[in-house]
Amino acid sequence: MQPTRGDNVLDLVLTNEPFLINNVEVCSPFSTSDHNSVEFQIILNSANTSYKFSSKTVTSRPNFNMADWHAIELYMQNVDWNYVFSECTSCAEVSDRFYAVVNECIQLYVPLKAVKHGKAPKRHYPPFVRKAINKKRQLWKTLRKFRTPELTARYRVACKACRAAVNESEKRFEDSLVQNGNLGKFFRYGSAKFSGKKNVGALVDSVGVLTNDPTRKAEILSQHFQSNFTFDNLDNCNVRGHRSGQILDNVDFTAARVEKALNKLKTKTAGGPDGVSPLFLKRCKRYLSAPLAIMFGLFFEHSFLPFDWLLAYVSPIFKKGDSSKPSNYRPISLTCTLCKIMESIIKDEVLHYLVSNNAISRRQHAFIQRHSTVTNLLECSHDWVVCLHDHHSVDVAYVDFSRAFDSVVHRKLLMKLESSGVCGKLLAWIAAFLSGRQQCVVVEGFQSDWSAVVSGVPQGSVLGPILFLMFINDVTDDPVNKVSLSLFADDLKLYS
């Protein structure tokens, strides 16, 4: 038995099952504590659990960071896409031929890497922090063998130096976030610091049983997300005809547009169900923009989407509250990058048309250029201050639509789009984009069964937010007398 604070044994591991605990070891103190940490293993036999530890689940995937980019660019440069597509008689064949060329290139010049699921990613510190950590560890090992006042003092100095190095590293990173000006990264960092919840905890199923099996957790969340869907009651919604007289029924896919969309890809994001990395597409944009423009044009003309484009890997994101309740998680869909590229071109065209023709309510502040939570708050604050200045009271009601993104009925959404002037081939392609979708939930690398998506717009897609705006757009029609309202996506404020 080893001491855990000075020469005293204060920290104990107690169990009524001696065979449950293994490899008890006294290690270095945690953070700023003056107690040594105690590490041990809990052994669970196959009778107590129905799954293997996810930390031992290893899969292989392409490591695009180690790809031979010179060979890849040379390979893609020599592809005769006119010949590749020449004998295709359907959109499905065009898709298959394109993916065959891309996948062959990836297999030839992109090495595989082993990926362990269920393990938290290692933190990557700069060299000066790693040096301080290693020095602290070495002194700790020496101190365990020769406990002298001199070594104890040196170890304490090393601990302080290590903490200072970590704090300096964090400070430099936060300074770089501020100077970079990327608001998305800044708010994601802040949100992660305050929430502290990244993974899926143990979940309670429908009969009240708590489980930590990742496969079972994926199934529980999948069933919950399915329960959020809304089935069409077949009632016709009252839609108003668009007032401008303009229509949007076509989108042109040019090589220049496709290359521009490829150039905007974030290379550190994951690929979707088709396995094609955004990094690969962006690095090969000069050679892929022309064939993709041809392919997108054919898909648009025939209202076609490849099978993989209708699939989504759903990552459950914890919101707040009790982490064991499935209702406190929201689904974020990971879809194919190529589909997102086509969506982005369509989205730009649709959004420009809607804004130019005042088809989106001016009270909506989400997903529109030069609109944000700031403009939403400024508008409301201005109205409230004016009322108070005129010695009037202000009553405010906050409305949150439950499961708003998941409850969008596709048929009614298409009716509202058509009433705003979106029609023809464009409306037909959007209908194909929404229908026949499937999703599976992924938890710690384990997947649920695939399930049909009968309503909603995919959260995580490019077109999804704009489609949702059009679905909720008429909530601002026919306002109650002397009642104003303001929207940010599905968050509604009513005030008078």
Model-derived segments and their meaning:
Residues 479-486:
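Conserved helix-loop-beta segment at the catalytic/binding core of cyclic-nucleotide signaling proteins
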Residues 396, 486-487:
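Hydrophobic "anchor" residues on beta-strands that sit immediately upstream
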Residues 37, 41, 45-47, 69-81, ...:
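Surface-exposed loop/turn segments and immediately adjacent short secondary-structure elements
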Residues 116, 151, 172-181, 358-368:
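Short, glycine/acidic-rich hinge or "gate" loops at secondary-structure transitions
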Residues 1-166, 209, 260, 339, ...:
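A shared catalytic/ligand-binding motif for oxyanion handling
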Residues 218, 225, 248-458, 496:
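Conserved pre-catalytic core of RNA-dependent polymerases
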Residues 9, 309-312, 487-491:
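Short Gly/Ser/Thr- and Asp/Glu-enriched loop/turn motifs at secondary-structure junctions
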Residues 75, 101, 105, 132, ...:
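Alpha-helical recognition domains of nuclear gene-regulatory proteins
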